[in-house]
Swiss-Prot record:
Official protein name in the record: Histone H2B
Similarity remark: Belongs to the histone H2B family.
Assigned keywords, A-Z: Chromosome, DNA-binding, Glycoprotein, Isopeptide bond, Nucleosome core, Nucleus, Ubl conjugation
Glycyl lysine isopeptide (Lys-Gly) (interchain with G-Cter in ubiquitin) crosslink location in chain: 118
Signal peptide from the UniProt entry: none
Localization per record: Nucleus; Chromosome
Glycan attachment points: 110
Originating organism: Urechis caupo (Innkeeper worm)
Any one GO MF annotation of this record: structural constituent of chromatin
Length: 123
């Protein structure tokens, strides 16, 4: 007796499995971007003999993302109020002054100005 031909359902399952295998090769893992290397570099500048746990690094990364989003949102709002379509360093500076308290804002503005000056001179 000749072997039975594969049923329709079995053929579909086999073709789905083959399709899944071919897409697995093409699928690349998405890179998770974080500020952890930069946070680590700053930590080593300030306290060379101190380490940081992965949980603490995760918290610091969330903090940096949160502050970044707040500054970006405030700068966007300021640009909108002044009917501007571009966020410039002036909007960022004003947003920082509005968001951060007292002395912290002054230090942030001076460090930001220093960074922008260094960047423009390197070009």
């Amino acid at each position: 007796m000749p072997p039975k031909a594969a049923s329709k359902g079995a053929k579909k399952a086999a073709s789905k499995a083959k399709a899944a295998r071919s897409t697995d090769k093409k699928k690349r893992r998405r890179r998770r971007e974080s500020y952890s290397i930069y946070i680590y570099k700053v930590l080593k500048q300030v306290h060379p003999d101190t380490g940081i746990s992965s949980k603490a690094m995760s918290i610091m990364n969330s903090f940096v993302n949160d502050i970044f989003e707040r500054i970006a949102a405030e700068a966007s709002r300021l640009a909108h109020y002044n009917r501007r379509s571009t966020i410039t360093s002036r909007e960022i500076q004003t947003a920082v002054r509005l968001l951060l308290p007292g002395e912290l804002a002054k230090h942030a503005v001076s460090e930001g100005t220093k960074a922008v000056t260094k960047y423009t001179q390197s070009k």
